[in-house]
Amino acid sequence: MSCAQGAQAPVETGPNALSRTFRTTDAGIPYPPGCPTREAKMVACTRPSLSIIPIAAHGLASYDGTIEINVLAAKPGSAAQKRHVDAGIPTAFRHQPQAVKAGDLVFISAQMAIDGGGRLIAAASDARQPRFGSRAQVQAEHIIDNIEKLCRAAGTSLDNIVRVLQFHTDLDEFYPVYQVWERRLGGRPLPFSAVEVPAPLPVPGATVMIEAWAYVP
């Protein structure tokens, strides 16, 4: 679904919603118009995982809107119990769950390398040492640490990751980040996609954002 700038967002975030992705051409709008009110009224346990992705244009669609919203939901009456997963991970957005578990799947909200104040971690933003190591790898290590914590809190592990979406503001950083995954997974295959997106990401200075799904045996 999509909404034009200035319109009320027709977002259905009922108890069956498991995962949401906002794709926006306007980096200055962290939520569609109307969404903060809707979010504030939502019961905390019903919120799906959330990723906000900057894009240059809306793919094949041609319209004046600034935001597209993708919602993945369980069928009404599904036996899969939905619950939030809390591993003490800082989140970048208001009302953003760390992860949502439903049945044997866990949906991890898009992660960036942020501290408890919602800022990019200091190790990834030291302007005094711009060529000391890889800023992308520092971000990736922090993000994958958080993904691993969320997997453990949900009763699974990095070994059971079934889907990774990786977003870069500079696709030249793809391979350095992939090397981190290779090291963390011991060379095991990874269902992996990498996409270049326009800067900035929602957290100033961040250049890598990762969303993941995992299987819970």
What residues fall within each predicted segment?
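N-terminal presequence-like segments and the immediate start of the first folded domain
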Residues: 1, 14-16, 23-145, 149-162, ...
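Extreme N-terminal basic, low-complexity initiation segments
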Residues: 5-8, 13
